[in-house]
Regions:
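Surface-exposed beta-loop interaction hotspot
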Residues: 142-209
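Flexible, glycine-rich surface segments
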Residues: 187-248, 253
Length: 315
């Protein structure tokens, strides 16, 4: 009888190894990279543009902002008389509607009898007001078509006034965009700051606040690596990014543009889609307090994506 080439025990071991390889080898193969769906991306950006427009045009959107008044310590009169500290449209307010009392950073409303101010649909004549830095948001006051709340910027306290019937809102000219371009949907990586870095951010009123940056976003354009610092705002998960580029002050708004990006995935990857870059509120109103891009976020190339500067008149 011819002897087997291998002892039976050896043959069984080899067979077991082959079976294991056949099971686990496919699992070890790298999955193919997902195919980019340009049509789906276009739909995503168009939906984002639609939501952007709706948010801008809503009753309490930035188009309705008509006034910003910084308070002095003590009593601050408000009403339609031009001598008041807070001047309201005469169609919506009496000559003297009441006072806002500023007391070491705290504001109290004192309305005159018969002035129909409400908050949350309920009449109010006296109350302490929360500002827009409060965790639950500011106290919103309504007087006719006016929407009034307290804002805090650096060490200053002010009264912001919106009007649902504002001229800017009525005469809004719409938004204009660069063509949607998937090349400006860029993969970046987060280079974390340990600990997170405090970055001084100046606004259009020359006020400066320190904001928290979780790390630099590093990405490539035309073979070169660039880094920008996002901001992680209080209570938010998405990163807020302020940028300027070589279109700034030309095709796009002169103070830069903003966008939000989702936080990094488990590998540290972040998608920056410049097709979602938009103009700050001060592109539409003279009464916003827009923060400005820090110097490290000034990019030395043209980003021909996202929102162009507003063609209408700012009142």
């Amino acid at each position: 009888m011819t002897k087997p080439a291998f002892p039976s025990s050896t043959f069984r071991v080899l067979l077991s190894i082959l079976l294991l390889v056949s099971v686990f080898l496919p699992a070890c193969r790298k999955s193919p990279a997902p195919v980019f769906d340009a049509a789906a991306h276009k739909q995503e950006i168009e939906k984002w543009q639609s939501n952007r427009l709706a948010g801008l045009k809503k009753e309490d959107g930035w188009l309705s902002l008509i006034g910003l008044f910084w308070l002095d310590e003590g009593e601050n009169k408000f009403g339609s008389d031009p001598s008041n500290k807070v001047t309201l449209p005469k169609e919506q307010a009496p000559t003297l509607a009441g006072t806002f009392k500023l007391d070491h950073g705290h504001v109290r409303l004192n309305a005159r009898p018969g002035v129909a101010i409400t908050t949350g649909g309920q009449p109010v004549s006296q109350m302490d007001l929360k500002d827009d830095n409060d965790d639950s948001g500011p106290t919103i006051l309504n007087l006719g078509t006016l929407i009034i709340n307290v804002v805090k910027r650096a060490e200053r306290i002010g009264i912001r006034v919106k009007d649902t019937a504002s001229r800017t809102r009525r005469e809004f000219k719409g938004l204009d965009y660069f063509p949607i371009d998937p090349k400006w949907r860029i993969e970046a990586r987060l280079e974390p700051y340990q600990p997170p870095k405090m970055i001084p951010i100046e606004n259009v009123l020359n006020m400066t606040d320190d904001e928290t940056s979780p790390g630099a976003l590093a990405f490539e354009v035309n073979g070169k690596t660039y880094r920008i610092d996002p901001i992680l705002e209080k209570g938010e998960t998405d990163y807020f990014v302020m940028i300027a580029d070589e279109t700034t002050g030309r095709e796009t708004y002169g103070a830069g543009r903003y966008l939000y990006v989702s936080p990094p995935d488990a590998s540290g990857k972040v998608i920056i889609d410049f097709n979602k870059a938009y103009s700050p509120p001060c592109a539409f109103t003279a009464f916003a307090t827009c923060p400005l891009p820090p110097q490290q976020n000034h990019l030395p190339f043209r980003i021909e994506a996202g929102e162009k500067k507003y063609a209408g008149v700012v009142h």
